[in-house]
């Protein structure tokens, strides 16, 4: 079953709103001056906390029970990542050179597809797992932020 969400943000905003049929269903919000990002989708709440300096790892925590759910490990070139979640491995990757399309897949194929266009975008999911949907969205925004930081220091 295909589920579609739309998302939007504002220029220089740390907050992304997620909609389904024009009804707000969730958000992803980065705390200022912090490595913590909270996300919510359909009442499922999660915290992403990134550790490391050159080799990053993100811990995924369920905010309802404050339980660890998994983590994200990034490749050195930051074009692919591995999500370890519920004792299963998922692959996250950019799907085009512009980095405006990305996806999450498992051994059976693509589970979630994302597409961005400036300050808006679409999420098409073939799973109802809100945590996995939010994780894929978080990873792209984390890598985009890291790329911007590198460009700013160059």
Report each predicted region and the residues it spans:
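Short, well-structured hydrophobic secondary-structure segments
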Residues: 36-65
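Low-complexity or membrane-interfacial segments used for flexible interactions
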Residues: 1-35, 41-43, 67-69, 74-154
